[in-house]
Amino acid sequence: MFKSLTGFLLLLVATFAQADRIRDLTTVQGVRENSLIGYGLVVGLDGTGDQTTQTPFTTQSLNNMLSQLGITVPAGTNMQLKNVAAVMVTASYPAFARQGQAIDVVVSSMGNAKSLRGGTLLMTPLKGVDNQVYALAQGNILIGGAGASAGGSSVQVNQLNGGRITNGAVIERELPTQFGSGNTINLQLNNDDFTLAQQIADTINRARGYGSAVPLDARTVQVRAPTGGSSQVQLLAGIQNLEVNVAVQDAKVIINSRTGSVVMNREVALDSCAVAQGNLSVTVNQQANVSQPNTPFGGGQTVVTPQTQIDMRQSGGALQRVTSSANLNSVVRALNALGATPMDLMSILQSMQSAGCLRAKLEII
């Protein structure tokens, strides 16, 4: 029996796939989403909006909006609002989007609002990097979190200051596209791989004739195509469903330093090595001792004396042998046998790679 690292060691064990479709391995160069951003106001909050004395931009935005609606707020008016919040609105402009198409938007508080639950986003223009308005957003916000507070205590589940509006924005301006204007199409691999790029080109050449595709580098495969959008759509519809026998992947271990999760693929292998690990813990405990003199008529003074205790413990440290492991199951058994915590495992893997015992690329994100 070996101790399971479930909960902090995530292992993705993939079965051998006979072939993958080109559509799953590549994307079409130039066919992508674009980011949109806007600033707006959320109203209708149940007393959980911005504190306007601490967020003057909320009051300024509200005054500007009211003036556009023909309502003038007297100068010097100190509006104490609790149902309004200033927010940033973001969205992704999909490729080939057409005027009138609805897209989802994400609404995020930028002030000190406690919650956006029950709020309504007022009409907000969404702009691109060229400062042009491409969509208008408005609607009721859906919040995935919940919270309650009373008597100085509070409970909160998930995030309350951010939400989503499904189909909350409408495209008002279309982006020009160069799709169909040239006589070539570039397929971009999801991951750099010279072998896979050559295999994709060979597969396309077998299906459409020699010279139809050529790998430009480890990420790009160029395909000859007829001009015209409809002709290139027909070409891609046939190419993307072709299957490619994927070669052996690079052995790779990914470590997330923030969450402590470790992910490795099936190509990871270990060489024999010995590992010693130890944990050093320091505990500091401080108590206040009150010393009161037993002289009620002598004018004594009560004195508070701090008493500090420091405890230092070191555990572990014994050498443990790690046997050679050629497959993922053996690697899992070898690492589980160490009984290491997630943070220990991160350090052990780094040391193994430095010692030449970990036959894999180590990436820390």
Curated annotation (Swiss-Prot):
Signal sequence coordinates: 1-19
Pfam family, one: FlgI
Keyword DNA repair: no
Keyword Iron set for record: no
Keyword annotations of the record: Bacterial flagellum, Periplasm, Signal
Biological processes annotated in GO: bacterial-type flagellum-dependent cell motility
UniProt function note: Assembles around the rod to form the L-ring and probably protects the motor/basal body from shearing forces during rotation.
HAMAP family: FlgI
Family: Belongs to the FlgI family.
Protein name (database record): Flagellar P-ring protein
Organism whose genome encodes this protein: Cronobacter sakazakii (strain ATCC BAA-894) (Enterobacter sakazakii)
